[in-house]
Amino acid sequence: MNIALLTAGGIGSRMQQDIPKQFMNIYDKPIIIYTMEAFQKHPDIDAIEVVCLDGWHDILRAYAKQFNITKLVGIVSGGKNGQESIKNGLMDLSKKYSPKDIVLIHDGNRPLVSQEIISDNIAKCIQYGVAITAI
């Protein structure tokens, strides 16, 4: 299986807004939904899990339902920083999936990930056991 682990645990303090930036709307859709749609549309992604701020889980679930994100399998709380948030997500996934499954970790505030980048990362993980994208 290929699982997308999206991080959306930050508060976006530099944005100086009342809501976290991943939930800010652009053209009537939250940024996190654009990111989720990129992985939802990819034929090789089997599941999506999101690491999310406490207090925003139900809102994220509602948006996922509204925008037909059917691959969402879980939402887990973030940590004190990005590293801890990723750890929380990976620990939760380790209870559900095999160590042989591929996990793509992606920043939920970066919605412009292409289908090609997702495909290339999966292919490189299969070939080498690990992959990283730097833009």
Q: What residue spans do the PLM features occupy?
A:
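Glycine-rich, phosphate-binding/catalytic loops in enzymes
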Residues: 21-25, 67, 120-122
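Conserved N-terminal catalytic core of the sugar/cofactor nucleotidyltransferase
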Residues: 33-100
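Conserved beta-loop-beta/alpha segment of the NTase-like Rossmann-fold superfamily
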Residues: 82-135
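Gly/Ser/Thr-rich helix-start
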Residues: 10-13, 29, 79-80, 90, ...
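N-terminal glycine-rich phosphate-binding loop and ensuing alpha1 helix
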Residues: 2-58
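Hydrophobic packing residues within well-ordered alpha-helices of enzyme cores
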Residues: 15, 60-64, 121
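Conserved beta-strand scaffold positions in the cores of enzyme catalytic domains, especially
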Residues: 23, 75, 130-132
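Small/polar loops that bind or transfer phosphate-bearing groups
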Residues: 7, 51-52, 77-78, 105, ...
